[in-house]
């Protein structure tokens, strides 16, 4: 079964990796730590302070599952996950989330050149208009970072 984790006897360990989290609270806390490390504590705190009671459950889901389980897996380095996110968010044309993940990619060790190459590669497969928007957002963030240094 190539493509996902297996135990020594060849069985999939996907379900056990999710089930082995001792509690939702621990997974949520781990997710919050990873989320803050990748996106920056200030960004996460600001975002969560603005969450309505209606939207709070989806933020909890994202923190626990996305950050606490998926981003915490050993299969890919954080930099690789960040570059993949930039490509996927470009394909989905999600500028707001894309901007946060540009900062996250830099925090995870991606270079400006690697971000640029990821966006160029993405342009070919998802379309130039989507990539142009991502280049615009990334450029604005990179300029902002340069001006703050």
Feature annotation, model-predicted:
Residues 2-79, 107, 133-149:
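Acidic, glycine/proline-rich low-complexity segments that act as flexible tails and inter-domain linkers
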Residues 128-129:
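Substrate/cofactor-recognition hotspot
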Residues 124-125, 142:
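Short Asp/Glu-rich motifs
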Residues 38-41, 95, 109, 125:
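Residues at alpha-helix boundaries and the short loops/turns that link adjacent helices
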Residues 83-86, 90-116:
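Mid-chain, well-packed structural core segment of small domains
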Residues 62-66, 83-90, 118-123, 134:
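Short alpha-helical scaffolding segments that buttress acidic/His motifs in well-ordered protein cores
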């Amino acid at each position: 079964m190539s493509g996902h984790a297996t135990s020594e006897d060849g069985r999939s360990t996907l379900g056990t990796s999710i089930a082995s989290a001792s509690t939702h609270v621990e997974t949520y806390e781990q997710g919050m730590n990873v989320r803050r490390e990748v996106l920056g504590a200030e960004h996460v705190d600001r975002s969560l302070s603005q969450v309505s009671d209606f939207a709070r459950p989806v933020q909890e889901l994202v923190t626990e599952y996305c950050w606490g389980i998926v981003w915490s897996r050993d299969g890919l380095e954080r930099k690789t996950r960040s570059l993949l996110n930039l490509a996927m968010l470009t394909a989905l044309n999600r500028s707001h989330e894309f901007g946060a993940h540009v900062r996250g990619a830099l925090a995870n060790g991606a270079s400006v050149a690697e971000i640029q190459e990821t966006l160029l590669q993405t342009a070919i497969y998802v379309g130039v208009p989507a990539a142009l928007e991502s280049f615009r957002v990334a450029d604005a963030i990179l300029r902002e970072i340069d001006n703050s240094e």
